[in-house]
Design a protein with these regions (language model features):
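Acidic-basic catalytic patches of nuclease active cores, encompassing PD-(D/E)XK
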Residues: 1-41
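Non-catalytic C-terminal interaction segments of nucleic acid-processing enzymes
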Residues: 2, 6, 24, 52-55, ...
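Conserved catalytic cores of phosphodiester-cleaving nucleases, focusing on short active-site segments
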Residues: 18, 22, 49-72
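Structural alpha-beta junctions
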Residues: 24-32, 91-100, 123
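Acidic carboxylate-rich catalytic motifs and surrounding loops in phosphoryl-/glycosyl-chemistry enzymes
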Residues: 34-40, 102-110
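Beta-rich catalytic cores
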Residues: 45
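Mg2+/Mn2+-dependent nuclease catalytic core
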Residues: 66-89
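Acidic, metal/cofactor-coordinating or nucleic-acid-engaging core segments within structured domains
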Residues: 84-104, 113-119
Length: 160
């Protein structure tokens, strides 16, 4: 699996930093009884984790790290996410009756952005483009043509 390589482990390190930041912001600063629960990184789970508040599931999420600054992401205008992942999160949102969230760690600025992608019924909360594009296949390189979603920058927020 790609996560077991040197690049995969570095990406996992960044993701753990991001999730710790989310934990401290959501739980400590806002005084909520929320927890971030990760899925097994050695498996290809349909989502990267769940948010649990007061013992109840309150969200599912996709999390990614990108070697970008906030300004670079703003210039791109959107966050590219594999469309299959968006649809998997949407289906889980529908089935579990919780929102689907996206967390993006911008490595260069150490900034966490987030998007509330669906409501608790699995309805998309904003429009986004879907296109077939050639992208990097894995953290370790290669290329592949996939159907990708482009989540608009303006629909995301910086986690403060």
């Amino acid at each position: 699996m790609d996560i077991l390589t040197e690049r995969g482990q570095k990406s996992l390190e960044y993701e753990r930093k991001m999730l710790e930041r989310i934990r401290s912001t959501m739980c400590d600063k806002h005084k909520t009884n929320s927890q971030i629960v990760e899925t097994d990184k050695n498996m290809d789970a349909k989502v990267d984790g769940m948010v649990v508040t007061n013992g109840e599931l309150s969200g599912v999420f996709e999390s990614k790290c990108r070697d970008l600054s906030l300004m670079e992401l703003r210039r791109y205008g959107s966050w590219l996410v594999t469309f299959d992942k968006i649809m998997d999160g949407k289906r889980l949102s529908e089935m579990l009756r919780v929102p689907y969230l996206g967390f993006l760690y911008l490595i260069k600025d150490k900034v966490v952005m987030y998007w509330k992608i669906t409501d608790k019924h699995g309805n998309f909360l904003f429009d986004f483009d879907v296109r077939n594009t050639r992208t990097q296949k894995t953290i370790n390189g290669g290329s592949v043509v996939r159907t990708n979603a482009y989540l608009p920058f303006k629909e995301g927020s910086e986690l403060l």
